[in-house]
Amino acid sequence: MTIAEWRQRLNNREISSLELVNEQFARIKDVDNKLHAFLKLEEDSARENAKRIDEARLSGKELPPLAGIPFAIKDNLCTKGVKTTCSSKMLESFVPPYESTVTQRLWEAGAILLGKTNLDEFAMGSSTETSAFGATSNPWDLSRVPGGSSGGSAAAVASGLCLAALGSDTGGSIRQPASFCGVVGLKPTYGRVSRWGLVAFASSLDQVGPFTTSVEDAAEVLQVIAGKDPLDSTCLDKPVPNFSEYFSDSIKGLRIGLIKECFEQEGISLEVKESVLKAANQLQSLGAELIDVSCPRFNDGIATYYVIAPSEASANLARYDGVKYGYRQHGEENLSAMTSLSRAKGFGSEVQRRILIGTYALSAGYFDAYYKKAQKVRTLISRDFANSFEKVDLLLTPTSPSTAFKAGSHDNDPLAMYLSDLLTIPVNLAGLPAISVPCGFDKEGLPIGLQLIGDVLGEQRLLQVAHHYEQAANVMGNCPKGDLIPA
């Protein structure tokens, strides 16, 4: 069911907000011991807020659009008075004194916080295995990863533990887990949504977006969280349009570009490629025109990203030293030793690896050879996209080269892990909006994701085409429920 359908049930008093919240917590208790999607539940406050909304509804008060709708929030978004750990020992006890802009907008719209979801430590990972508090499993197959870094949010939505969730996307961290878990994941244009209160990984790449079970719901959540924020200087001062305005309009005549560099990649699974091309043909049958386009530097995205993102991370994470807050190693003789050991024990191996890479790339003697060069390539990648959008309205690729891989299978091969974001990273480098929509299954019954990429601030068109595909392909609601999670 969509958020609109749940809202109708609530307004018709077929179910109360409290009953809906209680149903969600009952389901979480039934299955999350197997999934580990949540790090922390907010049961008391959720029930109190649900009762308050029920009372307002009974009194006939006009309610905001998400009144009574249960949400989960990735645990790198600050929630005032609620622990925000980034799945790191470094922030294990951190309780923010302020609310992130996106969560504040959700609560003002009536949404209810069920809890905080698991992620790769400081959002650095593609499998939700680097969490200091244990890995999350994929609800379609518990032996596989849910993707990352927002794997907890994706798994929670896919298994019906919440109606929607927020995640963050730095190089594919919403879209790749959405693909692996068979849900919708939307990364807005950089600056469309405020980053205030999002614990920074790579500030020029991070963006907040929703996980939902339908494109319609993704549009509705974006409607609430988008818009100018004086607390975030990178947030665009642009009008927020009606993101579902074009849903009823035909897509006949729209030009959709197939990026040939993506489909020529040797590392892409044949089943993934076939499923995505079938989805492209479905869009063609709806009247869209398919055009082959070239983004010559698309495949340089991985190398570029793994210079820029770690460089920004090394600067952003320098503040965690055990002095003012964060994990502190006691018993050391001096400040330098305490800081060094606090960081060594507070950060996991993947975070340490990226800090080292970033520090090296920014160091004197290597800045020009690595960081400066990567920024130049980033500009060229953005230019390739801009050239493509002179010929087409949207771009189409697989979301990920493969379906969900086995947990632990990439432990000793960081490069293989990094390559799982091969098709999503260039979008972040260019600051473009993109969405992952389920488009089929492989022979093992694992979901495959279709990625649609829009031009800057092109979310309306992006969501329109994704919605038309979703309706025509009848993929909405193909999510695992209790029967797909072994007892």
From Swiss-Prot:
GO terms for molecular function: ATP binding; glutaminyl-tRNA synthase (glutamine-hydrolyzing) activity. Keywords: ATP-binding, Ligase, Nucleotide-binding, Protein biosynthesis. It is an enzyme of class 6 (ligase). The keyword Nucleotide-binding applies. Signal peptide: none annotated. InterPro entries: Amidase (IPR000120), Amidase_CS (IPR020556), Amidase_dom (IPR023631), AS_sf (IPR036928), GatA (IPR004412). The keyword Nucleotide-binding applies. One of its GO terms (cellular component) is glutamyl-tRNA(Gln) amidotransferase complex. One of its GO terms (biological process) is translation. It catalyses: L-glutamyl-tRNA(Gln) + L-glutamine + ATP + H2O = L-glutaminyl-tRNA(Gln) + L-glutamate + ADP + phosphate + H(+). Its EC number is 6.3.5.7. Heterotrimer of A, B and C subunits. Belongs to the amidase family. GatA subfamily. NCBIfam families: gatA (TIGR00132). Allows the formation of correctly charged Gln-tRNA(Gln) through the transamidation of misacylated Glu-tRNA(Gln) in organisms which lack glutaminyl-tRNA synthetase. The reaction takes place in the presence of glutamine and ATP through an activated gamma-phospho-Glu-tRNA(Gln). This is Glutamyl-tRNA(Gln) amidotransferase subunit A. It comes from Prochlorococcus marinus (strain MIT 9211). The gene is gatA.
